[in-house]
Amino acid sequence: MRVMILGGDGFCGWPTALHLSARGWDVLVVDNLSRRNIDNELEIRSLTPIRTMGERIAAWQEVSGRAIDFVNLTVGKEFDRLVALIKDWAPDSVVHFAEQRAAPYSMKSARHKLYTVDNNLNATNHLLAAIVESGRDVHLAHLGTMGVYGYTTAGLRIPEGYLKVTIDTDHGPTEQEILFPPNPGSIYHMTKTCLLYTSPSPRDKRQ
């Protein structure tokens, strides 16, 4: 099995890459190293040194005997390269972590808000369109966050999936199915509530 991990240099992506590689999957990490660039921008360093991708991949091959491939690509900017990569590398699955993932960073300034929205929404939209354009039958896993529901108690256990609700109308009550209402507390969490990742247009047809 072959898996492409978008955002595979991140704090969730790299452990996922190691886990799946250890289980025998062929792994391709796709990342533009934005987390490292943000650390440089903020002049911060991890308490645990984070090695370069080359060093990480070499160390993993030394201890496991397995290779992890790497491509430097910005998912939300380089659509044609992404389509070509999906066609050529032919993944069975794609795990999508390629998003700016810090709520405080997303609220730091107008520029940081713009970057978070541009990166997070375009990355997901490009990925969905690229999968359709590639014509491949690819399983997609996307990382969510409980923060889309806010940080105050809802007074109940938030249900999964759709809720059946009754709505009063001029013609009497009607039943509908809805998602539990989101209440994002940051620009980052707002991007996670956007439903671009639910499905491409039902009118899209693979060739």
Segment roles from a protein language model:
Residues 1-89, 93:
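N-terminal Rossmann/SDR dinucleotide-binding element
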Residues 73-119:
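NAD(P)H-binding glycine-rich loop region in Rossmannoid oxidoreductase-like domains
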Residues 96-98, 125-188:
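Conserved Rossmann-fold NAD(P)-dependent oxidoreductase catalytic core, especially the SDR/UDP-sugar
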Residues 191:
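Active-site helix of classical SDR
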Residues 13, 79, 104, 149-151:
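Glycine/Thr-rich phosphate-binding loops of Rossmann-like dinucleotide-binding domains
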Residues 39-40, 104-111, 151-155:
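Conserved catalytic-core motifs of eukaryotic protein kinase domains, centered on the activation segment
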Residues 197-204:
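Conserved small/polar residues in nucleotide/adenosyl-binding loops
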